[in-house]
């Protein structure tokens, strides 16, 4: 939105019929509109409900990691949903290997919701530092099977012994119903038993959840479109 548009919304002539909503107009005059990210903008244009599905996954992570000291998001993309987790934890950092998305994240950063974002290739080296929560949504399915151990080992390296990890991915069964855009790059989707077995190599406790659309459940997993592994007690 241009400065002239912001000024128009903030002038005396632009008054809402109900006074409690005037703050919406005034806020735009002060800071402009919040903007969607690269991927979330495309979703909102092409398939609005898909943006809701993605945000619901972040909401689940936010509630599971609520109260954490410092959480790391791996494969943040445009980080549009990251703020939902940030709202529930004391500190958050996010990383991705694609600078195009990271520059977009930085360009949209606002002071109230500022967090650390940095580039890192998980196939090249572990992430330094220490975190009591690590999560990756819609990432593992993009990692070839032969690179999976390297990726997970490096991703989990900074997780403290008492920390929690959450891994989310589309189910293998969902792929026959997925759109070409959704399937693009998916080279390592798993069934629920496969994902649980994978994460049990790294954790003593792995709790599995299913998702259909925005609903999280523990129902019949072959009919789930999305899988979430909640992991604790590192091996």
Regions found by a protein language model. Name each.
Residues 2-135, 146-153, 158, 188-194, ...:
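Conserved N-terminal segment of class I S-adenosyl-L-methionine
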